[in-house]
């Protein structure tokens, strides 16, 4: 489609008439990204990247800085909202076959990896007890890499243990990565408008399109308003709902928490990591839990794009969603029976979705051919 940028500028971009609410999460992610950068800047102004002062500076922000408590809560809960939107966005892409826009899907998966890295670095910054130990456990996984692992870990830590240089590096990375995310988001949107958005039927949208503005802008604004309402209600009434009680204590390298775990949005990957009783195997499974998304465009074998008309794949998709929830829940529990077994079974089922997807596509093609 020629001159897409000019059409976007005047809000005249032709879009399929039948795209549903599931297509609104892209604009919601853009809003989340803007809010995170803005609140993050105001927090960075008052934050001190020093192991003796970091925890105190967070206390200072929430107690002494005007509306500092709001900035801190908006930033922390905004991150959770960001991940709710991105996981829904990915699920929609898997369900409706949006991954067949290869360049858009691959740039989006790269965005997810960058976002997860940024969120991880941000979780360490308050220098609470869980922040410190989560950083210790996750960064220590680098030592599982043959030959280079120990050197890479020492380089990342800035020494032989997590200390002041580690916090300084993590703050620098947490500050710089969002600019990379913004740049890549622009590329993601540009690539999307090169091919055009898919639709719930998985058909060619060219025959039935309407201008993006005002029709879809109003639809986007409705979902955006609901998201902001949910965010502000959580900030006002349940500000600590996603926080770990351990993180209200300053980091102490001499006391290990009973159960080390990251933020809720990493629990599915952490659950997959824990389910394998081998360091290198667990680290590989952790990486593969995200990287396997990159295989989706290349393993699609079905003649039908969307799962709207694929009942067997619908069953498998909702099994994947349930599996994701089960792994997240199991990862909050101690490493003991029956939780280890549940994690192992759920992790296997998670990967089985991506393995059986091309087989089911081939099977569906055979059924349609014989009918």
Swiss-Prot record:
A molecular function (GO) term: ubiquinol-cytochrome-c reductase activity
Binding positions for heme b b566 per the UniProt entry: 89, 188
A GO cellular component entry from the record: mitochondrial inner membrane
Superkingdom, taxonomy of origin: Eukaryota
SUPFAM superfamilies cross-referenced by the UniProt entry: a domain/subunit of cytochrome bc1 complex (Ubiquinol-cytochrome c reductase), Transmembrane di-heme cytochromes
PROSITE patterns the record matches: CYTB_CTER, CYTB_NTER
CDD domains given in the database record: cytochrome_b_C (cd00290), Cytochrome_b_N (cd00284)
Binding-site positions, heme b b562: 75, 174
Further comment found in the protein's record: Heme 1 (or BL or b562) is low-potential and absorbs at about 562 nm, and heme 2 (or BH or b566) is high-potential and absorbs at about 566 nm.
Cross-referenced PANTHER family: CYTOCHROME B
Protein name: Cytochrome b
Species name: Eryx colubrinus colubrinus
Designated gene of the protein: MT-CYB
């Amino acid at each position: 489609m020629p001159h897409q940028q000019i059409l976007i500028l005047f809000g005249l971009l032709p879009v399929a008439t039948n795209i549903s609410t599931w297509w609104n999460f892209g604009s919601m992610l853009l809003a989340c990204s803007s809010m995170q950068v803005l609140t993050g800047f105001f927090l960075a102004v008052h934050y001190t990247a020093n192991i003796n002062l970091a925890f105190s500076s967070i206390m200072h922000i929430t107690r002494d800085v005007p509306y500092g408590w709001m900035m801190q809560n908006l930033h922390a809960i905004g991150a959770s909202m960001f991940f709710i939107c991105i996981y829904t966005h990915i699920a929609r892409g898997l369900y409706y076959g949006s991954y067949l826009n290869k360049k858009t899907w691959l740039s989006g998966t790269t965005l997810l990896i960058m976002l997860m890295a940024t969120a991880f670095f941000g979780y360490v910054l308050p220098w609470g007890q869980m922040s410190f130990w989560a950083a210790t456990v996750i960064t220590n996984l680098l030592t599982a890499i043959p030959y280079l692992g120990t050197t890479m870990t020492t380089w990342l830590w800035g020494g032989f243990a997590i200390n002041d240089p580690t916090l300084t590096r993590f703050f620098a990375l947490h500050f710089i990565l969002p600019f990379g995310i913004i740049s890549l988001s622009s590329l993601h949107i540009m690539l999307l408008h090169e091919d055009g958005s898919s639709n719930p039927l998985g058909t060619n949208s060219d025959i039935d399109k309407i201008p993006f503005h005002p029709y879809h802008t109003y639809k986007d604004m409705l979902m955006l308003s609901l998201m902001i309402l949910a965010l502000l209600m959580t900030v006002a009434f349940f500000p600590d709902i996603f926080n770990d009680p351990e993180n209200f204590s300053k980091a102490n390298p001499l006391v290990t928490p009973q159960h080390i775990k990251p933020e809720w949005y990493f629990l599915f990957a952490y659950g997959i990591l824990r389910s394998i009783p081998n360091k290198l195997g667990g680290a590989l499974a952790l990486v593969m839990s995200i990287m396997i998304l990159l295989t989706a465009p290349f393993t699609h074998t079905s003649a039908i794009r969307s799962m709207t008309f694929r009942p067997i794949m619908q069953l498998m998709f909702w099994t994947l969603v349930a599996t994701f929830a089960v792994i997240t829940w199991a990862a909050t529990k101690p490493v003991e029976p029956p939780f280890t077994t549940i994690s192992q079974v759920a992790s296997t089922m998670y990967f089985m979705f991506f393995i059986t997807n091309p087989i089911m596509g081939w099977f569906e093609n055979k059924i349609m051919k014989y009918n």
